[in-house]
Structures are given as C-alpha cells and as structure tokens.
Amino acid sequence: KDQEPHYMENVIYNELLYRGYHVSVGAIPVFDHSSGKTQRGSLEVDFIAEKFDETIYIQSALYIPDDEKMEQELRPLRKIGNSFKKVLITKYEGNGAYDEDGILHLNLFDFLLNEKSLD
C-alpha cells in the first residue's frame, strides 16, 4: 500500500512517454519576503511534459483527503509564472474541470483512457 503513490507516478510517467512527451521533474524557484529578507526556496513539480512547443506541468496525488493536502499539491502549480497548462491527477477525485486558478483536475482513469485528456 505504501508503494501505491510511486506506482501511480510510474504509470503517469510511462503514459506521458507513450504519448510522445519528453518528461522531466521540475523545481520551481520561490521567494519568501515575509521576514523582511528575501529567502529563496523551491517547490517540486512531479512532471514537466514537453512536446514540440507544448509544456504541461503535472502534479500527482493518490488521494486528497483535506484542504491542507490540496494546498500542498496545488501550491507548486500556482507558483509557476507562465501560461502553460497545469494539471493535478488524482486516483479518483478529478472530474476533468478547471479550477479558479486554471488548473485542470483529472482522475487517473480518465487520464489513461482518454488520450486527449490533456488537450
């Protein structure tokens, strides 16, 4: 059971490769100014999928049991300062809709069974 999130990431990674994407892991630089000093950090994005001039940032989460976990997963996507597509894939919760930040929420099965799910 502990390995299930890793298996899910593996499935997503392989599906992205199958669809012709170059896939990498990304670190998004973030800056915190709350202390009066600028502190630099980074947030990890699970996948950066690139094909031709298309870039998609993808976060993967097995479950989103509460608002805190949702914020943890969405924060890196919200911090990306460009207009490329951003997607959160969960095992069951995603319904194929965009949220108020323009992030697409997909469930794993819709992602796998619909090759156009990222279009």
Descriptions of predicted regions:
Residues 1-119:
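A cross-kingdom feature that marks ATP-driven nucleic-acid transaction machinery
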